[in-house]
Amino acid sequence: MSFFDAVLGQHQVKEQISTLIQDSALPHSLLLYGESGLESVSMAIAIGSTLVGRQIFSPDEGRTYLSHIEQRRIESGESESTVKDKGLPVYIDQGDAFWIRPMKTQLSVEQWYTILDTYINVSSDTPRVVIVEGFQTANAVLANAMLKTIEEPPRNMSFIIVTTNIDTVLPTIVSRCMLVSIQPVSEPELVKALTEEGYTGDIHRAVRLARGNPTLARQWAETGTIESLEKAMNILEQLVERSHFFTTISLSLEGLSKNVVIDILRWLRILARDMLALRYGAPLEKMILSDYRFSMQAIVERWSSKALQRVIPVTLEAEQALRLNVRTGLVIDGVILALREAVKEDI
């Protein structure tokens, strides 16, 4: 049994990484990148487990391990709210596996110095691995602090960096890492996985709408909807209302994390694409989100082709602003106003 068995899809990556490890030729620094929900952390844990020679953390993206740590913190006297709101600076598994995750919303340079000064700044006779999750939240200070260690790593130390946006990673970091692209899972494999996990109902529909994203497919299979997609559809509906559109949309998006907002922006682009297809009479099978055709048909006449075409640049610019750590609320406000301006002449 391979540690990679817990990772859906990614067969070419698994084969390549396994061969490199067997040949002792794997670079000491890897950069895994792919959209949120593709379970890149599971791949990072599988690679780390293969390097160390045992299961590190837990194969379910570390969820079981993290739950165990949270329970231990509560039992030791920390309040449940503190434990839920703030993770540990570094998670350590038996002294040879280290995991840094964003605390609240961002990675901090203090987390790196903690692990560097206390744990890894020495050579070892046995393999050790550091997983850095959520690197899209890292600022330049942290990236530069990591760069020196990546350039001159301690002996037997491997670094696995995980990001949902490679475009925000410093070129100096990218150039020193082996790049590993995490891709959507094929529909047959994802259907098979959800069936084996015990999901019922219209799994094929869930997988089709999720477009190869395991996290979104499970969400649809459990609830019958994808929350970020529903919110995107609601935005398009509210933008063509004559009054209260700004307040209604703002309240519906209040308090959402950066990653969720990015998902909503992506769904807006897909919905706009399908609405353009509707306007030009494209057949049903050409639509990506055909299950939403009735909702789209109800408003498509109130969105001109020009306004729908504006959705793509507006949301891409907003996504880039979020990557650069512009306040989420300001980005949301900008999107609402820009898209309202695009449709205003049609209302």
What annotation goes with each model-predicted range?
Residues 1-88, 155-157, 164-347:
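Charged, glycine-rich active-site and insertion segments that engage polyanionic ligands
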Residues 124-129, 154-160:
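Loop/turn-to-beta-strand initiation segments
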Residues 92:
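Extended basic-aromatic, gly/pro-enriched interface segments that bind polyanionic ligands
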Residues 15-21, 85-88, 106-129, 137, ...:
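Conserved alpha-helical scaffold flanking the Walker A/P-loop in AAA+ ATPase domains
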Residues 99, 106, 137, 152, ...:
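Residues immediately C-terminal
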Residues 33-35, 99-104:
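A short hydrophobic beta-strand->loop->alpha-helix junction that borders the nucleotide-binding pocket
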